[in-house]
Amino acid sequence: MTTLGTPATLLAALLSVAIVAVAAPLKTDLAKSTVAAQFKQMNVPVEAKFRRFQAQIDYDAAKPEASKATVEIDTASLDVGEAEMNREVAKKEWFNAAQYPKATFVSSSIKPAGGGKLTVAGKLSIKGKSSDVSFPMTVKTDGGKQVFEGALPIRRLAYNIGEGEWKDTSIVADEVIIKFRVIAGQ
């Protein structure tokens, strides 16, 4: 006859399964998630969207400091709203998508900042250049899923985005804001 053990053993086993389930990576709903780049071109605001990206998020609301995130963006997928410009930004002077097909962010820390806000730090790598970054992010639950939103300002020239004649910041501003809204659940 097989026994399940004492009630305390059974409870401990069930709790450990529940804890593992909470700590499992969330499944990103890519159809409802967005990553965009906002910048100014000739002082006119532009918002372009990355059409292909992956986000792996291990998030535990009870222990946010144990959370991790990794994001990979297909640099050739930037859609600025015009096919010719989309091809242009994939070229060597901009993202050089042939040599650097992915931009990545890997978190090194996620800290609670109160009121549904987190401070996220990590390494951002674009076009062979990496730097440590930190930015605020909000997290809320909506329809049983986690919604992560934030904005990360960067300087495009620090990553060699816009080489040669495109270094001129009077045409395309140096400041770019990477905005994201990622929806994920179990």
Predicted regions, residues:
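Bacterial N-terminal signal peptides
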Residues: 7-18
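N-terminal secretory signal peptides that target proteins for export/translocation
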Residues: 1-6
